[in-house]
């Protein structure tokens, strides 16, 4: 039964490699006490890009930048580019949207885990990014 549930993705792409392409974490309040009782504000920007590497192999990159502030002080900034190499089993150009959206859904749990762990290891409450609508992100 599980193989039938995954049939749509199996027809579309094969995961060949997943990796961190670039990462940066700036801990701007590590040695300072946060004196505010205010809830931190988090701004998250997300971008997707894909490039054909060769033949049917494509690299998909999920870019996430998160900036967290308390009042006017920046607590931390994290920038992550997480990528995957996928073999596309389709060649129809209108399927590009489906590839990018499905590929981003594969990459996202890894991105969320990395960001959660880095912010926790940076001395802050873990930043847990809520599920994203990759169809909407692709459209923008």
Which residues does each predicted region cover?
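N-terminal intrinsically disordered, cationic/polar leader segments
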Residues: 1-140
